[in-house]
Amino acid sequence: MNLIIRRIIPFLLIALAMVNGGANISAQERSKGLLIRVIDDETLQPLPGVLVHYGREGNVTNEEGNIDLPQGLAANTTVSFSYIGYQKISLSIDKLRRSKGGVIHMTPITEALEEVVVTTEGNTTRRTAVGQSIGALTLGMQMGKNLGEAVQGVRGVSLISNGVSSSQPVIHGMYGERILILNNGVRHKSQQWGQGHAPEIALAQAGRVTILKGAESVRYGADALGGVIIVEQASLPYSQEGIKGSTTLYGATNGLTYGVSGKVEKGMGHHLAWRVLGDYSNSGDKRTAQYLLNNTGQRQWSMLGQLGWRSTALEAELLISSLQEKEGTYFGAQMGNVDLLKERIEMGRPPQDVITPFTRKIDYGYHTTSHSLAKLKMGYTPNNRHRFEGMIAYQLNLRNEYHLRRNKLSHVPESALVLQNVEGEFLWHYTANKHLEVESGILGTFTDNYNKPGTGVVPMIPNYVQGGWGVYTITKYHTDMWGVEIGIRGDGQRTEAVGIDYDGQNYGGIEHQNNLTYSIGGYAEIANGLTLRSQIGSAWRAPHVSELYSNGLDMERGIYMIGNKDLKSERVFKWVASLSYRNSWLHADLEGYLQWVNNYIYQEPTKAYRTLVSGTYPLFAIKQTSAALHGVDAEVTVYPFSWLSYTISSGMIWANEQSTGRYLPYMPPLHIREEIKGEWAVLGGKHKASISLQHKFVAKQNRFDPDTDLIKFAPPAYHLVGLNVGFTQGGIAKNSDIIYRLSIENLFNKEYKEYTNLARYYAHDLGRNIQFSISYNF
């Protein structure tokens, strides 16, 4: 690690020195009109209907794939080329004029992951950022899964689970409230209730998911300690003629899952566009390799609507979305007494005589959740130098938890939470010239969380209100070969909590937080195809109310949680760097990171138990320490032939308490992933076929402290094998196709346990799952 630091830091220092030395900026040249031809990089056939945006205007290529860019565009004007199923390309007018023959080669999206680069204005990623994105085609293969499951294949990203469907992403060892999730540009707030449930985000509503791995507090504010996950829609199709969309039917053998999703969108006269999405899924009891997991069924409904309008300088967009979910709680995590609970944890699985036949019925206990969002976003671009953006959003989150209760009261929720949030943001983007940019913004947010009365149970967390503000500025200087970015941000937060405990006593209080964070990053094209990115930054988060005052059952994990009102704010200093190499047959990436966390918050069993009407549960307490985390992730993809690729990736993390060296709990062990994939054009290129074989190895977690767990050992290592087969049937109609997908997870039905699945105390992970989907795109 020291060698990596010695080799990487000098590049960042050189970049800073170059900024301080200044640069001569030439006057902007003006284009004289430019004819561009867009073709498929594999078939060399022209691509009609490609969306081409330049400045505040846009158009589409004709039937021959040609477009004539207008005269008068500045040499540094960015021109972007977008087409469904192809990787987006963004180039300046100056580069287009120097391109060979004025021909743009667009590459079909065949890889699951794309590197994050700067493209057009308003994009959520930056060239200095270390991260990756998952495109719409790959998300289409994740139907029926949650957000954490969809992103766990990204370098440096793993999963922490609380059962068969409640999981959260882990970035460089950070999870829960340390990962900020932006749902269509709005901070997802329901995670403040605790870590026992997955984010209420439907993948069917996502056009793209981006994972940023640095300490991103300067741009995104508090809670972005470990990174940011951005779930967003594709741009509205203003220039699209006619109605387009898709519909997908999917099913899976594990849980006998079935579902349907659909999308319809249309552009109207280049100034108006709309989009509507919908999704429904239904599943019953899931299954391990050897036995059923009773009461693990799930129902989910979601919808999203967008309406956008734009003129030469103004634009406005309204987005409304809603998600409803009902999910059962595994019976095996609900024991009648302490002895039975200890026996079940020692067995690590339910006895065969208590397992009942498969059913879709969701019985007590279960929970229902609802997430609704409304957002209005506006933009104003008076000229090529200035752009202003404003956003206001409202979200409503509801959660009801039902348990088996006495006196026929099971239909009354034991917990009924309502969380409302209003968020506003105003941004200013200034482009001084083709090298220098400045972005500044101000954010305000207000949250009101309360417990509905009438449950007959003391709430797990108190009622609270929380207000916050943030102001930041980021300066970016970039050339074709290198660039730097420096940012600073100030934040303030006030939280007032009021509750009543089991003894009828009031508790709570008022917390004030003010923080200053900063970041500095850079990139350098060291050689042809070799790129270095590095970022250093600080971040912070205040302890959430659930960590301060929790006193109740976390039904997802089957544990009773006790908060700690003396917690202090977590403060992080993080350095992350990546080195990537690209040529026609080899893609290689190496990432390293160091994180120092003051006042690291974690959960630890107390070795005590709490008995409720619904069962007996282990007692966990919230604790705090100073921690150090560092790790490395690597990935190599080889293309021996144009139709064949082989990818291998691996990641390792070390996480310790600074004062004692003691291992931190729930850190992912060493893992290795492999995939060999073939793709072919068949029947003269009219159709496409693909097949891939995956292998995953997860080592036993030897960096494990038994005092931080309910059991004295970590699960053994395991191997999993998967298979994916796809076929795209083209020529159904103009611009239409049908995609057939078949995937098999855990092909050999391996029985195993994942260390970071907190339900491993009671059961194994899922067995074989065969999934099939058929999508019609029109």
PLM segments and residue spans:
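N-terminal periplasmic accessory domains that precede
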Residues: 100-105, 138, 147-150, 167-170, ...
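Flexible loop and strand-edge segments within Gram-negative outer membrane beta-barrel domains
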Residues: 283, 289, 294-296, 300, ...
